[in-house]
């Protein structure tokens, strides 16, 4: 069981990383809430991990905190929610927001996540309610909100060319597709979130937040 990984960040794409650990490259899938906290390529990265073994694949999922890892592990225990859907949930909302949804039985907000309908949202609340409330102190102890990396801060000061804007848009759409959104919805979400954004991470963050607010 691989429970933690520390190494050099070789590649980073929304939802998937390549980390060099003593010459061995590990592909690690991450929620966007973890992706936002990453440093630049060639920087050191440390993640808590959960290893999933299936008949057709072995996949490693990484999280910025032990709490997020625990929440993920509880989510995938819910009938009808696999690892991909759990990652989509933790991409659209942090652990605190998820806890609020569970406490308030906000089925409509949970149903904004791709792959989750009303029935699945209701089942999620029933099955995870007590477990998540027991973790409330750990969840609230985490720093609220997402972290803006120095790379994002520097990029926000730079002008965006048409070519760069197209690249950011396409990368954002690909990330939203990977999270389970349909092509038409992904393009609409990315387009509405573009504004003066200068990184794909910024667009994706705004798109996911916008999706939650519009249906919350």
Curated annotation (Swiss-Prot):
Tagged with keyword RNA-binding: no
Gene3D superfamilies linked: 5' to 3' exonuclease, C-terminal subdomain, DNA helicase RuvA subunit, C-terminal domain, Nucleic acid-binding proteins
Keywords: Cytoplasm, DNA damage, DNA recombination, DNA repair, DNA-binding
Region annotated Domain II, chain positions: 65-143
GO cellular component: cytoplasm; Holliday junction helicase complex; Holliday junction resolvase complex
One GO-annotated biological process of the protein: DNA repair
Domain III, as annotated region: 164-216
CDD domains: UBA_RuvA_C (cd14332)
Gene Ontology molecular function, alphabetical: ATP binding; four-way junction DNA binding; four-way junction helicase activity
Locations listed in the record: Cytoplasm
Signal peptide (UniProt feature, chain positions): none
SUPFAM superfamilies linked: DNA helicase RuvA subunit, C-terminal domain, Nucleic acid-binding proteins, RuvA domain 2-like
Main location: cytoplasm
Keyword Zinc: no
Ranges where the record places region Flexible linker: 144-163
Region (Domain I): 1-64
Domain note: Has three domains with a flexible linker between the domains II and III and assumes an 'L' shape. Domain III is highly mobile and contacts RuvB.
Role, per record: The RuvA-RuvB-RuvC complex processes Holliday junction (HJ) DNA during genetic recombination and DNA repair, while the RuvA-RuvB complex plays an important role in the rescue of blocked DNA replication forks via replication fork reversal (RFR). RuvA specifically binds to HJ cruciform DNA, conferring on it an open structure. The RuvB hexamer acts as an ATP-dependent pump, pulling dsDNA into and through the RuvAB complex. HJ branch migration allows RuvC to scan DNA until it finds its consensus sequence, where it cleaves and resolves the cruciform DNA.
Assigned protein family: Belongs to the RuvA family.
Complexes and interactors: Homotetramer. Forms an RuvA(8)-RuvB(12)-Holliday junction (HJ) complex. HJ DNA is sandwiched between 2 RuvA tetramers; dsDNA enters through RuvA and exits via RuvB. An RuvB hexamer assembles on each DNA strand where it exits the tetramer. Each RuvB hexamer is contacted by two RuvA subunits (via domain III) on 2 adjacent RuvB subunits; this complex drives branch migration. In the full resolvosome a probable DNA-RuvA(4)-RuvB(12)-RuvC(2) complex forms which resolves the HJ.
The protein's name: Holliday junction branch migration complex subunit RuvA
Species this chain originates from: Francisella tularensis subsp. holarctica (strain LVS)
């Amino acid at each position: 069981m691989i429970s933690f990984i520390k190494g050099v960040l070789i590649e980073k794409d929304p939802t998937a990383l390549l980390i060099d650990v003593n010459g061995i490259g590990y592909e690690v899938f991450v929620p966007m809430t973890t992706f936002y906290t990453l440093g630049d390529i060639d920087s050191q990265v440390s993640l808590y991990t959960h290893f999933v073994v299936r008949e057709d694949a072995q996949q490693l999922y990484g999280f910025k905190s032990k709490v997020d890892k625990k929440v993920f592990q509880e989510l995938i225990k819910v009938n009808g929610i696999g690892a991909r859907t759990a990652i989509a949930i933790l991409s659209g909302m942090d652990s605190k927001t998820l806890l609020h949804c569970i406490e308030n039985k906000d089925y409509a907000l949970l149903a904004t996540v791709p792959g989750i309908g009303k029935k699945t949202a209701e089942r999620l609340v029933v099955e995870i309610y007590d477990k998540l409330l027991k973790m409330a102190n750990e969840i609230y102890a985490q720093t609220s909100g997402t972290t803006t990396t120095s790379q994002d801060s520097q990029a926000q000061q730079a002008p965006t060319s048409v070519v760069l804007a197209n690249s950011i848009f396409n990368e954002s759409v690909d990330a939203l597709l990977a999270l389970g959104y349909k092509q038409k919805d992904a393009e609409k979400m990315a387009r509405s979130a573009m504004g003066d954004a200068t990184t794909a991470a910024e667009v994706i963050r705004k798109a996911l937040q916008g999706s939650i607010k519009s249906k919350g």
